[in-house]
């Protein structure tokens, strides 16, 4: 019997872009941010990154909280950090909540559907490993009309551990037979490099970060590509 072939994808940032999040922020508070010489993209990235940092610190110290809750809580602090002296006088709670809601409106990247199809046509089973909740993440695929069975959507949120803790990847790796072909694919170098450390083969797409900053990571990627379809083709070729 031939070895089974699997690719586990990160979702948010890899399969899904942040454009809708940034656009939502711009729609809700863009003019207010502009009055402080702050762009929606700059604030959105800073807010999201600050939330990821606190989310990870909470997880590491065994006080795991859902990411969406952390994102909401960090809103006013982030505004202050980017130069708004009195954030609550500039933005209302209702506007904050509307900005948080925009995070649920993320859309699949161009090429994501083609990427999955290339892999499935080559006999791969496509999985997703996310720190987000399955309902929200599944909605990204459902709205785009892209097949992603719920049973193939894995969240480490319920385990009380967040990527890139190595313990977040090991249960997924353990689902597969030792001789199976097992890839992890992401547009975050911190994510895919951690997956490689537990035993996955690594595929990295530059579509989000552009610069992999490879010098600070101690793992080598077998596939690096600029688009999701090209990454999929590299995985197929590398598995022959």
Please describe what each predicted stretch is.
Residues 25-29, 47-51, 71-72, 99-103, ...:
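Hydrophobic alpha-helical core bundles mediating ligand binding, dimerization, or RNAP-core interactions
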């Amino acid at each position: 019997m031939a070895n089974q072939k699997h690719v586990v994808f990160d979702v948010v940032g890899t399969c899904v872009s942040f454009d809708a999040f940034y656009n939502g922020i711009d729609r809700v508070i863009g003019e207010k941010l502009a009055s402080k010489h702050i762009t929606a993209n700059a604030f959105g990235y800073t807010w999201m990154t600050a939330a990821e940092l606190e989310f990870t610190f909470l997880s590491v110290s065994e006080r795991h909280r859902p990411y969406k809750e952390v994102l909401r809580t960090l809103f006013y602090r982030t505004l202050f950090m980017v130069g708004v002296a009195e954030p609550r006088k500039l933005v209302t709670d209702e506007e904050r909540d509307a900005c948080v809601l925009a995070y649920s409106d993320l859309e699949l990247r161009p090429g994501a559907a083609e990427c999955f199809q290339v892999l499935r046509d080559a006999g791969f089973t496509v999985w997703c490993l996310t720190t987000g909740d399955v309902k929200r993440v599944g909605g990204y695929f459902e709205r785009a009309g892209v097949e992603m069975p719920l049973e193939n959507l894995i969240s480490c949120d319920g385990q009380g551990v967040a990527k890139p803790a190595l313990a977040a990847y090991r249960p997924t790796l353990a689902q597969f037979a030792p001789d199976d072909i097992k890839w992890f694919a992401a547009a975050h170098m911190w994510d895919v490099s951690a997956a490689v450390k537990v035993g996955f083969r690594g595929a990295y797409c530059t579509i989000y970060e552009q610069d992999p900053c490879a010098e600070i990571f101690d793992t080598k990627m077998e596939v690096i590509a600029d688009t999701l379809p090209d990454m999929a083709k590299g995985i197929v070729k590398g598995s022959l």
